A protein has these predicted regions:
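Conserved catalytic core of the tyrosine transesterase superfamily
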Residues: 1-192
């Protein structure tokens, strides 16, 4: 069954072009599932039943894991068994009707104006690191891009003439305007 997981992760990477974090999480979730299955006498993919998967989800919930963690595990299992069915390694998808627990969506904590100003004022020195940190914070604040988008940003994604940055994520491209302050911080970092 470990080879099945390996093949699935390769499929995600090559065909679905998933992020490394997604692949690591899915692999960890599925290896834990395999341990449970093996401990309960299931040693082949085609021997997995909806009942044993349901029991596993109940055990995850009762172990004190957060609903979001259990929900991600269910998503991992559903994707894995769907793949196994497509690859004809199992005649039916045992995870098809598996239900994930409800996850409460919490509103993000919003910084006050004072907190934001203090955060943006943090990088005080003119060292390369200080200028880099200032440029990063200003870009995050001014554009609302994700940290993952920021760290994958290339110089060619920045158009200083128009004041826009281009973010490419999951085959989508977004043009996002920079504020003059963010643009200046970025120019200053690049010049140093």
């Amino acid at each position: 069954m470990n080879q099945d997981i390996h093949n699935f992760i390769q499929y995600l990477h090559q065909e679905k072009q998933t992020s490394e974090n997604t692949e690591v999480s899915y692999e960890r979730d599925l290896k834990k599932m395999i341990l449970y299955l093996t401990a309960h006498g299931v040693d082949r993919i085609d021997a997995v039943t909806p009942e044993v998967l349901n029991s596993y989800v109940i055990e995850l919930e009762q172990s004190g894991l957060k609903p979001a963690t259990v929900s991600r595990s269910v998503a991992s299992m559903k994707a894995f068994f769907h793949y196994e069915e497509l690859e004809q390694r199992t005649s039916a998808d045992p995870a098809f009707e598996l239900k994930a627990p409800k996850v409460e969506k919490k509103a993000p904590t919003i910084l006050t104006t004072e907190q934001t100003n203090r955060l943006l004022a943090q990088p005080k020195d003119n060292s390369a690191k200080g200028l880099r940190d200032k440029a990063m914070l200003e870009l995050l604040y001014a554009t609302g891009i994700r940290v993952s988008e920021l760290i994958s940003l290339k110089l060619t994604d920045v158009n200083f003439d128009t004041g826009y940055i281009t973010c490419v994520d999951s085959h989508k491209e977004r043009m996002i305007p920079m504020t003059p302050v963010a643009k200046d911080a970025l120019v200053r970092y690049i010049r140093e």
